[in-house]
Amino acid sequence: MLSTSRSRFIRNTNESGEEVTTFFDYDYGAPCHKFDVKQIGAQLLPPLYSLVFIFGFVGNMLVVLILINCKKLKCLTDIYLLNLAISDLLFLITLPLWAHSAANEWVFGNAMCKLFTGLYHIGYFGGIFFIILLTIDRYLAIVHAVFALKARTVTFGVVTSVITWLVAVFASVPGIIFTKCQKEDSVYVCGPYFPRGWNNFHTIMRNILGLVLPLLIMVICYSGILKTLLRCRNEKKRHRAVRVIFTIMIVYFLFWTPYNIVILLNTFQEFFGLSNCESTSQLDQATQVTETLGMTHCCINPIIYAFVGEKFRSLFHIALGCRIAPLQKPVCGGPGVRPGKNVKVTTQGLLDGRGKGKSIGRAPEASLQDKEGA
């Protein structure tokens, strides 16, 4: 798992539940007694991981089914949403094994250790990359609406998705190679065992891809989006769009930034002056808490990117076989859209709030008002 970084201490657990290491805190001239984080994790993590798995699996499978059965993947946005849901599912299917391992020990062997660690990393990086693509897609649809009609094609979505998966796999390779099943303190543990140089490289890479890069892209894109929306005249729709955009941006960093900061501090303990007994013990606890928080983000994605839209709720009822009123507007050039007519064609997919799209032939500023329901 991402947080199970190999400790540089030789650990022995005594009967009192404290972790005694050969590390000496020279400020006090005594061995470092660390509270056993694993003991707490064995009680709390299995039920937490189980809840995350259940809600996340149901939510993301629902998104996948609706996108495939109802939407038919006719929008670039829907293609990215599908891949984001798949990323979360890859991430989620590893949780039952981590839950079992936290309660007992790793009993699935070295091959399964590498396989599920690979799925975990690929789902993690894939989720980040598709959030970035959704951000860029939203930027093009709102700020460069006319250009977006030509550039945001299904073919472009498929090609960029394939490239994104390849990059996610490549970013996951170090974690897969250096992860193995090994016996520690009489129990088998599945975790990464990086050489010193590789551990530093992997932590820096993870922070660049998981924190710095998405932060930079989101600030640039959403700054342009906000400037464009603030020039529009429809105040109610404008405020709704701004709220959704800020939710997308803030929630991701709210769930994953603490974890990225903690693993950076944990890897470079000596540089930050955190190599004393008390600090390392607090970092161990913070690592476990922040990773669990980050894992729950895969449950939030279906809510942020899908359930906030009225169109999605309509499609949800259709998927369940309910009889409801027809949608107000055709979706992505679907049924009801006739070539050569000045009709409305949505460019936002399931992210639409009220499903209003761009009218072909309109001036860019006029069309932007239709997109504010995102």
UniProtKB/Swiss-Prot annotation:
Q: Where is this region: Disordered?
A: 348-374
Which SMART domains does the UniProt record give? 7TM_GPCR_Srsx
Its transmembrane ranges are: 43-70, 81-100, 115-136, 154-178, 207-226, 244-268, 286-309
Q: How is it modified after translation?
A: N-glycosylated. Sulfation increases the affinity for both monomeric and dimeric CCL2 with stronger binding to the monomeric form. Binding of sulfated CCR2 to CCL2 promotes conversion of CCL2 from dimer to monomer.
Q: Which UniProt keywords apply?
A: Cell membrane, Disease variant, Disulfide bond, G-protein coupled receptor, Glycoprotein, Host-virus interaction, Inflammatory response, Membrane, Phosphoprotein, Receptor, Sulfation, Transducer, Transmembrane, Transmembrane helix
Sulfotyrosine-modified residues are Y26
Q: Which GO terms describe its cellular component?
A: cytoplasm; dendrite; external side of plasma membrane; fibrillar center; membrane; neuronal cell body; perikaryon; perinuclear region of cytoplasm
Recorded consequence of changing L119R: In PCLUD; likely pathogenic; loss of CCL2 or CCL13 cytokine-mediated signaling pathway; loss of expression at the cell surface; contrary to wild-type, does not rescue CCL2 or CCL13 cytokine-mediated calcium mobilization and cell migration, when transfected in CCR2-null monocytic THP-1 cells
What topology in the membrane does the UniProt record assign? Multi-pass membrane protein
Which PANTHER family did the record assign? C-C CHEMOKINE RECEPTOR TYPE 2, CELL ADHESION MOLECULE
Subunit (UniProt):
Interacts with ARRB1. Interacts (via extracellular N-terminal region) with beta-defensin DEFB106A/DEFB106B; this interaction may preferentially require specific tyrosine sulfation on CCR2. Interacts with NUP85; the interaction is required for CCR2 clusters formation on the cell membrane and CCR2 signaling. (Microbial infection) Binds to HIV-1 Tat.
Q: What does this protein do?
A: Key functional receptor for CCL2 but can also bind CCL7, and CCL12. Also transduces signaling mediated by CCL13. Its binding with CCL2 on monocytes and macrophages mediates chemotaxis and migration induction through the activation of the PI3K cascade, the small G protein Rac and lamellipodium protrusion. Also acts as a receptor for the beta-defensin DEFB106A/DEFB106B. Regulates the expression of T-cell inflammatory cytokines and T-cell differentiation, promoting the differentiation of T-cells into T-helper 17 cells (Th17) during inflammation. (Microbial infection) Alternative coreceptor with CD4 for HIV-1 infection.
Name this protein carries in UniProt: C-C chemokine receptor type 2
User: What organism, scientifically named, is this protein from?
Assistant: Homo sapiens (Human)
Q: Which gene encodes it?
A: CCR2
